[in-house]
């Protein structure tokens, strides 16, 4: 019985780690949801290459919401940025991977 519980706990943990955890956002709801979905897609597609994932997010955001978007993806960074109001999203994905997306023109 203990083995079955361990597998269930592991499955629950993996399921929790596949959803983005938003730490801070001042984006409008619709933009935030689209950006979160884009971040999840990019991080899953380029799971071994954060630079390619960031490039995909930046290029898509530039096309969809105008230019001057910036993206940082990593496991160990801090940031202090200047950004346009209602254009910032900071989230965690996969447990330890942080994604920061902001617009600054």
UniProtKB/Swiss-Prot annotation:
It is found in: Cytoplasm, Cytoskeleton, Cilium axoneme. The keyword Secreted does not apply. It comes from the Eukaryota. Its main location: cytoplasm. The gene is DNAL4. InterPro entries: DLC_sf, Dynein_light_chain_typ-1/2. Keywords: Cell projection, Cilium, Cytoplasm, Cytoskeleton, Dynein, Microtubule, Motor protein. CDD domains: DLC-like_DNAL4. Consists of at least two heavy chains and a number of intermediate and light chains. One of its GO terms (cellular component) is cilium. One of its GO terms (molecular function) is identical protein binding. Belongs to the dynein light chain family. GO terms for biological process: microtubule-based movement. Pfam families: Dynein_light. Force generating protein of respiratory cilia. Produces force towards the minus ends of microtubules. Dynein has ATPase activity. Transmembrane segments: none annotated. It is linked to Mirror movements 3: A disorder characterized by contralateral involuntary movements that mirror voluntary ones. While mirror movements are occasionally found in young children, persistence beyond the age of 10 is abnormal. Mirror movements occur more commonly in the upper extremities. This is Dynein axonemal light chain 4. The lineage of its organism: Eukaryota, Metazoa, Chordata, Craniata, Vertebrata.
């Amino acid at each position: 019985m203990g083995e079955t519980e361990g597998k269930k706990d592991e499955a629950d943990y993996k399921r929790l780690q596949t959803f983005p955890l938003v730490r801070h956002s001042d984006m409008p709801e619709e933009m935030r949801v689209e950006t979160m979905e884009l971040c999840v897609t990019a991080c899953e597609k380029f799971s071994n290459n954060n630079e390619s994932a960031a490039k995909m997010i930046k290029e898509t955001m530039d096309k969809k919401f105008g230019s001057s978007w910036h993206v940082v993806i990593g496991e160990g960074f801090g940031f202090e940025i200047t950004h346009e109001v209602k254009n910032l999203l900071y989230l965690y994905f996969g447990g330890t991977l942080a994604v920061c997306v902001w617009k600054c023109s």
